């Protein structure tokens, strides 16, 4: 997963918070 913090996009492939599970935010 890529995209943490300010550069995070709310897509199923981005990690919005901490670690990514099942490819969802």
Swiss-Prot record:
<dbReference type="GO" id="GO:0005246">
    <property type="term" value="F:calcium channel regulator activity"/>
</dbReference>
<protein>
    <recommendedName>
        <fullName>Omega-conotoxin CVIB</fullName>
    </recommendedName>
</protein>
<keyword id="KW-0027">Amidation</keyword>
<dbReference type="InterPro" id="IPR012321">
    <property type="entry name" value="Conotoxin_omega-typ_CS"/>
</dbReference>
<feature type="modified residue" description="Cysteine amide">
    <location>
        <position position="25"/>
    </location>
</feature>
<keyword id="KW-0108">Calcium channel impairing toxin</keyword>
<keyword id="KW-1218">Voltage-gated calcium channel impairing toxin</keyword>
<keyword id="KW-0964">Secreted</keyword>
<keyword id="KW-0528">Neurotoxin</keyword>
<keyword id="KW-0872">Ion channel impairing toxin</keyword>
<dbReference type="GO" id="GO:0005576">
    <property type="term" value="C:extracellular region"/>
</dbReference>
<keyword id="KW-0800">Toxin</keyword>
<dbReference type="GO" id="GO:0090729">
    <property type="term" value="F:toxin activity"/>
</dbReference>
<comment type="function">
    <text>Omega-conotoxins act at presynaptic membranes, they bind and block voltage-gated calcium channels (Cav). This toxin blocks N-, P- and Q-type calcium channels. It shows high activities on Cav2.1/CACNA1A (IC(50)=11 nM) and Cav2.2/CACNA1B (IC(50)=7.7 nM). In addition, it shows a higher potency when Cav2.2/CACNA1B is only expressed with the ancillary subunit CACNB3 (IC(50)=1.6 nM) than on Cav2.2/CACNA1B expressed with the ancillary subunits CACNA2D1 and CACNB3 (IC(50)=12 nM). Both the Cav2.2/CACNA1B block by this toxin and the recovery are voltage-independent.</text>
</comment>
<dbReference type="GO" id="GO:0008200">
    <property type="term" value="F:ion channel inhibitor activity"/>
</dbReference>
<keyword id="KW-1015">Disulfide bond</keyword>
<feature type="disulfide bond">
    <location>
        <begin position="15"/>
        <end position="25"/>
    </location>
</feature>
<comment type="similarity">
    <text>Belongs to the conotoxin O1 superfamily.</text>
</comment>
<dbReference type="GO" id="GO:0044231">
    <property type="term" value="C:host cell presynaptic membrane"/>
</dbReference>
<feature type="disulfide bond">
    <location>
        <begin position="8"/>
        <end position="20"/>
    </location>
</feature>
<keyword id="KW-0638">Presynaptic neurotoxin</keyword>
<feature type="disulfide bond">
    <location>
        <begin position="1"/>
        <end position="16"/>
    </location>
</feature>
<keyword id="KW-0960">Knottin</keyword>
């Amino acid at each position: 997963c890529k995209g943490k913090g300010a550069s995070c996009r709310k897509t199923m492939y981005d990690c919005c918070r901490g670690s990514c599970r099942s490819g969802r935010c």
